[in-house]
Amino acid sequence: EISCSLVGSEMCIRDRSRNSADTSLRIIHSLEYYDMDIGRMVLSGGEDISRYLSAFGVDLFLSCNENDVSNAIHAGFAAGMIYARDTKYSFPDNQIRIAFDADAVLFSAESEKIYQEHGLEAFNENEILNQDVALQKGPMASLLKSLSWLQNETKDLNVLRTAIVTARNKDTGVRVIKTLRAWNIVVDEVFFMQGAKKADVLACFGANIFFDDQDVHAGPASDVVPSARVPYKEGEM
């Protein structure tokens, strides 16, 4: 399990494992072998790791363990369940690229719930009617805010690029743009896919990671870029 925090202009990566302290030497040797710059470790011996996230100032928690990810989400942290793939991904040199879905990821699930319960037409009507009302923050909003700050701090280096890849169309996308303005956040690229498949666009963007709330999008995307599913909070949908 990997978490990261943004300190100053540096991104700190930490390993959080359910292994015991007795197994730590093998983990340390593996990190050295793969030349991974991870200095701080938590070996919880099987205990829930989410309780320690605040102590380490974590901005993002990633794991293949859905229960740990759900616990982190409920505790108020940006978190995603990574899809384990054997794919050898290709990444842009000297730049980190992070892509997000919109509803139930960057923004709350309020609009997604309308779509799930009442259909696309009701969703479109609601978003156009409320285009001047900013969407509520979702589980990844705090991460995007931190990334936006980091971009501003390192803008001369051009080491970070962000994108939104959403199933919304251009008309319902107006609310997305206005919400980002209200948050004083600039995203480099936005793709309003109108329900089209996201994987090809993500491959062209060259995402180092993509966050989506639905397996129907995150699953296929994980074949071309590292992807993580963001679970809903209990009772949210």
Regions found by a protein language model. Give the residues of each.
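Eukaryotic modular interaction domains in large regulatory/scaffold proteins
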Residues: 148, 163-166, 170-192
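Active-site neighborhood of HAD-like aspartate-dependent phosphohydrolases
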Residues: 1, 92-141
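Conserved acidic, metal-coordinating active-site core of Asp-based
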Residues: 123, 139-141, 152-161, 169
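Single conserved hydrophobic/aromatic residue that forms the stacking wall/gate
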Residues: 2-8, 12
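A cross-kingdom feature marking solvent-exposed beta-strand/loop segments within repeated
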Residues: 23-70, 75, 80-88, 178-212, ...
